[in-house]
């Protein structure tokens, strides 16, 4: 059976022909369970992002050397990002060689070890080493979870299910603020805040023991019987046969490519360069528009706005985190109904407005030199609006797009590389925010972020295609057409023998 791309399982043409085979978000309990289990990796990511913002307030109280050094504060925050950067870079290879399941189990072990080290840290420097371990686990998980969910999901609901991972990230941030608030009056405040983070890692490790490997990874590793058993838990018999035929066609195409894939290969093919530019660019702009500045330092920002109480700062930050989680729920719906590109653009326009409000409020606050007051509350409003606009769009879109724009053979490596770009960008922002705010002023810092958001709008318009509802094969065709023009016949499995020639053509571009 030969499948052309318009009739591939899950494509719009296929689902128009067989509407009874269309699946819904809640149509398969197995897929939901897999999504939530894999998404705990996102919860670890989110919890670590949020918990350090509150813990830092109390770490400064326990260690005078930390209180006296903005650089040391930034290092405690950003060392997890250094670990995540390394973990994400290695995570692509771990995913492709050992599989998505083993990569997740490895991430859980490393994260739990880091949580124990942080909770027991006798000084800031041991604490920093624990942050590095936690970051390694988060980095591997950030690569693995979106790809694992995407490869197990029907294409018609893939965007929403991958976005569930982002919901878990924002849910983890909200949970961290709840935990922060719960331990404010408990001896050893920050140790409890940081130590509790190991619990979700242990839970995910146990649950993942009962989860299968990605069916697409199994199929490409020639473990077809196992892959079919996994697919049978998702699809009924009629669509199952079509999905198997589609994977067989994809496998034949993969055989025409080089069996050993290296990082430099990504830059030798024009179509892969274009895909990586779009994916990595989205990841970079997600960070440089300031989201983790807000999440890492929101209690500190609230205190900068004139609200000096630790408890009040944490409470207002808890509201911001709750809005972030709620906004992500909205994004899960819209990402498969409005599309990735429109959602990202509307999100960025709102982010620009919010950052301008934050900038104006801090400029005025510095002129009046009063605590709290009108401009303090205006800053809190700006934070809230920022989250309202960012969470549904630029929160889930970069991770969703990166889980679906790369060919199977390159998905692990490209996903790892783009996630590394995210973590490097995250590190730069986290390590410099307080320093820039001290040197240039908080108002100017947010104005710079607004300017970067304007550049992000231009980037999305020019470089990011719409991938809503497309199969992996259809997405690949977009990059081939952008790289080489609209070549007649692309998309038929009978043309797979031409792949090697085109990749060689791309390497000379």
UniProtKB/Swiss-Prot annotation:
PANTHER family: PROTON MYO-INOSITOL COTRANSPORTER. It comes from Arabidopsis thaliana. PROSITE patterns: MFS, SUGAR_TRANSPORT_2. Belongs to the major facilitator superfamily. Sugar transporter (TC 2.A.1.1) family. Expressed in seedlings, leaves, flowers and pollen grains. Not detected in seeds. This is Inositol transporter 1. It is found in: Vacuole membrane. The C-terminal domain (465-509) is necessary and sufficient for vacuole membrane targeting. The di-Leu motif is required for this sorting. Disruption phenotype: Reduced root length at low concentrations of myo-inositol. The sorting of INT1 to the tonoplast is independent of the AP-3 adapter complex but is brefeldin A sensitive. GO terms for cellular component: cytosol; plant-type vacuole; plant-type vacuole membrane. A motif (Di-Leu) lies at residues 502-503. Disulfide bonds: none annotated. Vacuolar inositol-proton symporter involved in the release of myo-inositol from vacuoles. Not involved in glucose or fructose transport. The gene is INT1. One of its GO terms (molecular function) is myo-inositol:proton symporter activity. It is a multi-pass membrane protein. InterPro entries: MFS_dom, MFS_sugar_transport-like, MFS_trans_sf, Myo-inositol_Transporter, Sugar/inositol_transpt, Sugar_transporter_CS.
């Amino acid at each position: 059976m030969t499948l052309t791309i318009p009739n591939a399982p899950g494509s719009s043409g296929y689902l128009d022909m067989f509407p009874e085979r269309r699946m819904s978000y809640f149509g398969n309990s197995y897929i939901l369970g897999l999504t939530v289990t894999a998404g705990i990796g996102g919860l670890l990511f989110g919890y670590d992002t949020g918990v350090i913002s509150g813990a830092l307030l109390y770490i400064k109280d326990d260690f005078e050397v930390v209180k006296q050094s903005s650089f040391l504060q930034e290092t405690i925050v950003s060392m997890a990002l250094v670990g995540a950067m390394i973990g994400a870079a290695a995570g692509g290879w771990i995913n492709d060689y050992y599989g998505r399941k083993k990569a997740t189990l490895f991430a859980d072990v490393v994260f739990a070890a880091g949580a124990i080290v942080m909770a027991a840290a006798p000084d800031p420097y041991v604490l920093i080493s624990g942050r590095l371990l936690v970051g390694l686990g988060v980095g591997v998980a950030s690569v693995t979870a979106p790809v694992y969910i995407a490869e197990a999901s029907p294409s018609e609901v893939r965007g929403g299910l991958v976005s569930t991972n982002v919901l878990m990230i924002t849910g983890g941030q909200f949970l961290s603020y709840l935990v922060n608030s719960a331990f404010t009056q408990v001896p050893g405040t920050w140790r409890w805040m940081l130590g509790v983070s190991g619990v979700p890692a242990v839970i995910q490790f146990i649950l993942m023991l009962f989860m299968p490997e990605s069916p697409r990874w199994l199929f490409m590793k020639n473990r077809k019987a196992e892959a079919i058993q996994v697919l049978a838990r998702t699809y009924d018999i009629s669509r199952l046969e079509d999905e198997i035929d589609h994977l067989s066609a994809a496998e034949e195409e993969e055989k025409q490519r080089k069996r050993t894939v290296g990082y430099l290969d990504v830059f030798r093919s024009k179509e892969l360069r274009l895909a990586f530019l779009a994916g990595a660019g989205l990841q970079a702009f997600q960070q440089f528009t300031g989201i983790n500045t807000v999440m890492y330092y929101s209690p500190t920002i609230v205190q900068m706005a004139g609200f000096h109480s630790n408890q009040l700062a944490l409470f207002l930050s808890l509201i911001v985190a709750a809005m972030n989680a709620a906004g992500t729920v909205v994004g899960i719906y819209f990402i498969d109904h409005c599309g990735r590109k429109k959602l990202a653009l509307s999100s960025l326009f709102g982010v620009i407005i919010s950052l301008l409000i934050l900038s104006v409020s801090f400029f005025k606050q510095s002129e009046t030199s009063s605590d709290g007051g009108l401009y303090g509350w205006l800053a809190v409003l700006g934070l809230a609006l920022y989250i309202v606009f960012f969470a549904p769009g630029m929160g889930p879109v970069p991770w969703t797009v990166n889980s679906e724009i790369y060919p199977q053979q390159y998905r692990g490596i490209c996903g790892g590389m783009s996630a590394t770009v995210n973590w490097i960008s995250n590190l730069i922002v986290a390590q410099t925010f307080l320093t820039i705010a001290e040197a240039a002023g908080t108002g100017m810092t947010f104005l710079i972020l607004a300017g970067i958001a304007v550049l992000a709008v231009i980037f999305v318009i020019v470089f990011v295609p719409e991938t809503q509802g497309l199969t992996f094969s259809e997405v690949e065709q977009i990059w081939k057409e952008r790289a080489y023009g609209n070549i007649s016949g692309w998309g038929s499995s009978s043309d797979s023998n031409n792949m090697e020639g085109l990749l060689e053509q791309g390497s000379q571009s």
